[in-house]
Each structure stands twice: as structure tokens, then as C-alpha cells.
């Protein structure tokens, strides 16, 4: 999606918000070589442990078009899963366990995939474009794509951190 398609970008952002997404950005479906080099260093150091599939899918991970050669653009949506209250307040209650906020609700893979399917169907109907969706279960380095799209920064802990959403 280039400048000729600004109306589509605006539509994606508005439709994404209607589907419950907080943020939307668009970037090229390609990653700079430094991302592949970083993954290579990680794999060569053995940091992937017994997750052999990471090495087996290295090329697909670093080349988004390896899974779908027609891909030219990545549209990244973000959703804040934080609760309305401060989750740190629960730490004082010694009678109950505390788990990560992202794991407290329904499985986010299912929640987000359902929303994305709705959005993808509407985009395909509107434009005639082919659309594929991924919710961090495919060998796709979505966090570097999100950073490249301007949604935040990927930190040492590998999470994407955003100024607006943490």
C-alpha cells in the first residue's frame, strides 16, 4: 500500500478500531538483512534451546514473502489487553495467585484471529485483494515488522514496546 492508497489506510485504521484494535500501521512485506543476522546470531548461540523449528524455519522467518510470494504489504494491528484496573493491586492479596495479564482472558490467538478474519473479509470485498492473516503462530517475525511500521521498539526482552500502549 503506497501513497496512492491513503484512503485504504484510513479505512483500515477506522475498520480496525471498529473491530476492537487500538492501532494500525502499514509497512513493506520485507525485513532488513540485520533482522536475519540477529536471528542467525541467536540460533548459532543455541538460545532457541530445543525449539528446533526455529532453525528449520529460519528463511521463512526472515523473509515474509517466503510464505506467500505475492505479498507486498504487511498491515499490523495492535490491541491493548490491559485491564481497566491496575493489575499490580492484586499482588497484595496473598490468598490468590497472580498470572500475567495477557493470560487472564480468552486465548488472544482466538480473539484476534476472529477479529482479523472479519476485517480481512471486508478488505478483500472492498479491494479485490488477496489477504492472509497471522496471529503470531506462523514463522513470521511480526515484532520486527511492527517496529518497522512505526508501532514501537523491539527491546532486549524481545517484546515490542510502544509509547502509547506500553
Per-segment meaning from a language model:
Residues 1-166:
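Auxiliary alpha/beta "docking" domains used to position bulky ligands
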Amino acid at each position: 500500500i503506497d501513497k496512492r492508497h491513503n484512503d485504504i489506510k484510513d479505512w483500515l485504521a477506522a475498520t480496525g478500531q471498529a473491530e476492537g484494535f487500538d492501532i494500525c500501521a502499514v509497512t513493506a512485506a520485507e525485513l532488513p538483512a540485520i533482522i536475519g543476522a540477529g536471528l542467525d546470531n541467536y540460533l548459532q548461540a543455541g538460545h532457541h534451546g530445543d525449539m528446533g523449528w526455529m532453525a528449520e524455519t529460519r528463511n521463512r522467518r526472515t523473509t515474509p514473502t517466503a510464505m506467500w510470494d505475492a505479498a507486498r504489504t504487511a498491515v499490523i494491528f495492535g490491541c491493548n489487553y490491559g485491564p481497566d484496573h491496575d493489575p499490580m493491586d492484586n499482588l497484595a492479596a496473598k490468598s490468590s495467585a497472580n498470572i500475567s495479564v495477557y493470560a487472564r482472558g480468552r486465548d488472544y490467538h482466538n480473539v484476534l484471529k476472529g477479529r482479523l478474519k472479519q476485517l480481512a473479509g471486508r478488505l478483500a470485498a472492498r479491494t479485490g485483494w488477496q489477504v492472509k492473516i497471522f496471529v503470531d503462530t506462523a514463522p513470521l517475525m511480526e515484532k520486527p515488522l511492527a517496529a518497522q511500521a512505526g508501532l514501537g521498539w523491539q527491546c532486549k526482552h524481545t517484546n515490542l514496546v510502544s509509547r502509547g500502549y506500553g
